[in-house]
Amino acid sequence: MTDTTPSADLGASSQQPAKAWSGRFSEPVSDLVKRYTASVFFDNRMAEQDIRGSLAHAKMLARQGIIGAQDLADIERGMAQIKGEIERGEFNWNLDDEDVHLNIEKRLTALVGDAGKRLHTGRSRNDQVATDIRLWLRDAIDQILALIGDFQKNLLDVAEANAATPMPGFTHLQVAQPVTFGHHLMAYFEMTRRDAERFADCRKRVNRLPLGSAALAGTSYPIDREFVARELGFDEVCYNSLDAVSDRDFAIEFCAASSLLMTHLSRFSEELILWMSPRFGFIDLADRFCTGSSIMPQKKNPDVPELVRGKTGRVNGSLIALLTLMKGQPLAYNKDNQEDKEPLFDTADTVIDTLRIYADMITGIRVKADNMRGALTQGYATATDLADYLVKKGLPFRDAHEAVALAVRAAEVRGCDLPQFSLDELRAAMAHVPGAADKLADDIFGVLTVEGSLDSRNHIGGTAPAQVLAAVAHARTRLG
């Protein structure tokens, strides 16, 4: 999610305040080490989730009689004030307090006294941060799922409007067969539908509560983890304390789903870039998604799709970073895991921003239908239809394939497309394949038209305009 945390003073104090853990040590941490090990620079964006988790924990402690009712009231009052300070940009984030957790706890203690010191009873920063990350990531996934839906709705509108707009379908970037632009766009709907399913499935594993696992072995206090899970909207608790505080597979899974989504959008971006080039001339993008050149006044560059391609590498890199981070860690928690947040945050930010832009950009595509159709006059796009025609007339497919290949070669020599041959010319081109020429009749010319080719693919998943419209309607039903 885009970081909206107010800026704050993150400098270290000239004094050496006592750390939450300093009693064990005989000398203070050096300023260099403080800066190297602190995470408050980036984990303060989880402040809202940290407060939510702490309030649920405090309610449980009071409910179990571990802290008093007045302690709970003081904690709730202090947290409300802290939340307001953060939202107004008035909270003083301090490097000396290392991370979001201790910064908030120290401020709470300053506001409410001993009640603030009692808040950490029965928990560790290990299970606290694992809970914060899951809360934050759950929010991010919900936002991403909504944005995928926005993108898909706009994509369906463009696909419906172009359900019968013919264009070349490509394999190996060579003209293959006629399809419609709407059918082509619906391929990306299906890709992002699977992406949404992956995020929704990942959310199930994110939505498990680590809190109560403490440092690694659980706690001796009579806590009620199920109560906290209900308070925070988790489906269940994590059932092994070692696993709960130490693994980040849920974050890796999220980054993997993000990499797949970005890969799909990168492929789409590559096509938009190609289609916008004068060599294709299939579409134009709205000016607000393009930039010019500082030296070439005629240029209109598709910078947004190009950056989507580039940022896909960035998201893939974050996935590799997290996999590498986890691969060598013994159980349980290690400081290595502090490095999980920046790749995770950056991945979510990139995906969210990309989806927001794409949902708008898709509505600004101007389709150049004449150019799309004109491209079908090159590359013998209906050659397969001619082969299928011969097969339906009784010729074995391999013989039909050979006969049509000979016809294409003859068309290349003549410099024309297959529909420009007369019936006799087509028969002559296929004469070397026994039985092929005899199968041809005047009805072949209806088969060789673009419309004939498109209409013949009239089955579920096919490119016939009627099927594209049906696919759009079905997709809208699934979206709700």
Curated annotation (Swiss-Prot):
GO MF annotation, one: argininosuccinate lyase activity
Q: Which leading EC class covers this enzyme? A: lyase
Pathway of action = Amino-acid biosynthesis; L-arginine biosynthesis; L-arginine from L-ornithine and carbamoyl phosphate: step 3/3
Task: Please note every region of biased composition (Polar residues).
Answer: 1-17
Give UniProt keywords alphabetically: Amino-acid biosynthesis, Arginine biosynthesis, Cytoplasm, Lyase
Give the subcellular location.
Cytoplasm
EC number from the UniProt entry: 4.3.2.1
InterPro entries of this UniProt entry?
A: Arg_succ_lyase_C, Argininosuccinate_lyase, Fumarase/histidase_N, Fumarate_lyase_CS, Fumarate_lyase_fam, Fumarate_lyase_N, L-Aspartase-like
Q: Does the keyword Nucleus apply?
A: no
Domain of life of the source: Bacteria
Note down the stretches annotated as region Disordered. 1-24
- What is catalyzed by this enzyme? 2-(N(omega)-L-arginino)succinate = fumarate + L-arginine
| SUPFAM superfamilies the record matches | L-aspartase-like (SSF48557)
Protein's GO biological process: arginine biosynthetic process via ornithine; L-arginine biosynthetic process
- PROSITE patterns the UniProt entry points to: FUMARATE_LYASES
Cellular component GO terms, alphabetical:
cytosol
Write down the NCBIfam families for this protein, in alphabetical order: argH (TIGR00838)
HAMAP family, A to Z: Arg_succ_lyase
Family membership, please give it.
Belongs to the lyase 1 family. Argininosuccinate lyase subfamily.
Q: What name does this protein carry?
A: Argininosuccinate lyase
